[in-house]
Amino acid sequence: MRCVCGCIAALCNIMFVQAAEKAVPTVMRAWQLDSWTGVADTLSGIDSSYMHLPMRNRLNDYSISNISNSNLISPSQSRIYFDRQKTVDFLFADAYTPYIITPQQVKYYHTTTPYSTVAYKKGFVSNLDQNEINFSFTGNVSRRTNLGITIDYLNSYGRFANQEGKTFLGSVFGSYNGDHYSLQSSFSWNTLSNFENGGLQNVADLQGVLKPEDMPVRMQGMSAFRYLAGYLNHYYSICVERERKVNYRERDEEGNWIKKDSIKIEYVPVTTFRHIFEVNDASKRYVEKSAKQSILPNIYRNPTATNDSASCLTIKNTLAVTFEEEFNTLLHFGAMVYVMNECQRHTSAIGQTENIIHLEPFGNSYNNVISNTLHLMPDTLYGVRWTNNTYVGGTLYKHRGEHIHYGFDGNVCLLGYKLGEFQVNGHVDAGFRLGKDSMTIAAKAFFRSETPDYYLQHYLSNHYRWNNDFQKTLRLRVGGEIAYPTQWVKPKLNITFENVTKHIYFDTDGMPKQVDGSIQVLAADLQVNLTTPWVNLDNHIIYQHSSSEYLPLPTLTLYHNLYYHDCWFKALDVQIGVDMRFFTKYYAPILNPALGQFCVQDIEQVGNYPVMNVYANFYVKSLRLKLFAQYQHFNASFMNKRYFEMPGYPMAPDMFRAGLAWHFYK
């Protein structure tokens, strides 16, 4: 580790010295890559804004409302259906999505000067501190080559017993952009561990005198998750030369600016041949020191302790040919065809059984009932199964132009375990002037047939086992968005509808089930930001309706942020405000600790409680230094104590937080 830190420091020093010698202006370009085609999606660059710094964390960045165990590091699920993303093809990764950096989430950069950021945030609670450290660095080692690294470390003890979580994640990335040959490569990692407490034994303790950390909890377990990914995207473009007139300015002998022009030769790609290689390994482990005292329903393998694990290794190779949009000046669109092969290794614990001990699932009774007697092998055996899938697909797109852009893509699995799986996606957006401002309109749709995750079909652990024959899930989604930002009001409305056929969910007993029919979900997402020179009010309102109790959603989810902002003494940017999060009552699913899945329940509703934070945010311009202080959930001290993430799991009580972020660039 010391050697790695030394290499990073040396590389940073070399790049900063080179930038200082050349005295060039700071220009930065950033992009991410599409998961199927590897095509770059250009971004604006590093976000150096000081606004809303206290609210930025892994969970809030994922969705405006999430179910968790109330700790910053926790298995989680968005309460907003259309925010839920499956980024890794591994069932047990779903609950850790906010903490995963996939190759498609890695940002690549081209910078004229090196850029780095260091951030530290801390929650102050006696012996239950919360710490977050972020570091990022990127810089060009030559005109065409860029290298960078990001590192995030989070450690949060949680406010209740047996709730501590830790995660260490980051990425190392590099890119080369030549006239004909280019490549992007990355290695990303995530290691996460969190203790499981099953919620409070008695929720009435919230109304008593016990401190949160002294309230009895229902179990003692631990979960660990690891994700590693390597990625290489490289391509060669056949180009034609094109002359372009370039206007520029330079000083004459007397120091006056004069306008000049010249002819620049640029390379326009005609056809691009691309190869993408990706390998990732995801694994999940669940441990209990005493299986007999677990709140989980059965014991299949070891009556004294639980040590379950499952993993999925995925290797992908993609070959693609692109007919570039830049060269197609007649029809003004680009096209791509590709073939992708995916090889997966599924490894899980399998064993033989002896005592099947039934415990009341998620109940308060720990009385064991022997329901069956079978033979037990005390050791854990491991079963390995390889699967292979081959896809063909294509895209048609128009990214250039001022007014209308579109993209259509699709693929189908022709061979392998996922035979017959397919997806068709499309989007169109248009922008035009309306009065003094610009309006944008967009529409999206997809139709997908999805093969159930391997571990939804086959799984064996100390508490659960199943062999299912689920059918493919069909999903049809259509949606539209309209935005019309003006000087004082910035409204944006998104309406989305989805029909899900053969939806798979986890039932109250922790077993996966498939709905024999269709479920409809409708959501209206309205954002209205009111701005004045000094006071802003940001509003985010989401309405959701689900036609089935097997897909529970809150009807309304709200986020409001009222704040004052100004510049003091022409040197200090200031933001002072209060924000609130709220969702209406509903039958929230409850976390199953052994599976890391959220199971439906119809016993208790949670919601109708606002979580309010007050904060102050500062930016010292001359130092490029951001500072903040926040009193989180301050209303917990004077409102009723019926605040729950899900049944049995209270929200975190009030806490004081502070932090800083420092940017370094020439």
Each language-model region and where it sits:
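Membrane-proximal, glycine/serine-rich, low-complexity loop/turn segments characteristic
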Residues: A19-L228, S237-R251, K264, D429-M439, ...
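Exposed, low-structure sequence patches enriched in small/polar residues
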Residues: T113, A224-S290, N302-K666
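Generic signature of intrinsically disordered, low-complexity, basic-rich segments
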Residues: C5-G6, M15-A19, D41-Y50, V369, ...
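Bacterial Sec-dependent N-terminal signal peptides
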Residues: M1-A23, Q630, P653-F656, L660-K666
